[in-house]
């Protein structure tokens, strides 16, 4: 995940609702480095949070494994991610796909969801609220398939 790309996706998503990042309420779901752990050292979530804070966003976060964290000079506390709390935010960003997250409930409660973990792949409702990283949203797709061989074959065949 590239933090600048995620921040750009948030900006583009909010623009759909005629909102800017400045003064928007953004909820980060998951700040840990990976799923179901408490370690957030070197987590890309921290860079995403810094970028959005620098753009004037009002950030909150939820992480069942990280009850508090330092962001710059501030200490943030994990908030409870109830449907009512989620609905208060202009955008929800799924940065770590903890097993405890009810993705269906998150999407149903949110106005806009930026899904960086493909955790909404099985949802069929509220798709208009979801922007997925690498899912044809004019952003790079991070595939595990190495298609460089396919490209080389096509080039060789065309000559």
Regions found by a protein language model. Give the residues of each.
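Structural/interface elements that position substrates and couple domains in central-metabolism enzymes
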Residues: 1-159
């Amino acid at each position: 995940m590239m933090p600048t790309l995620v921040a750009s996706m948030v900006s583009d998503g909010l623009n759909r609702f005629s909102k800017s990042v400045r003064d928007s309420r953004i909820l980060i779901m998951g700040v840990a480095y990976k799923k179901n752990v408490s370690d957030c050292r070197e987590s890309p979530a921290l860079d995403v949070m810094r970028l959005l804070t620098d753009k004037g966003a009002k950030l909150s976060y939820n992480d069942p494994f990280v009850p508090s964290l330092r962001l710059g000079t501030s200490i943030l506390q994990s908030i409870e991610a109830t449907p009512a709390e989620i609905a208060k935010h202009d955008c929800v960003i799924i940065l770590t796909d903890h097993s405890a997250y009810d993705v269906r409930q998150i999407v149903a409660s949110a106005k806009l969801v930026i899904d960086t973990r493909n955790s909404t792949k099985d949802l069929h409702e509220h798709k208009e609220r979801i922007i997925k990283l690498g899912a044809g949203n004019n952003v790079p797709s991070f595939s595990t398939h190495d298609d460089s061989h396919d490209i080389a074959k096509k080039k060789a065949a065309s000559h």
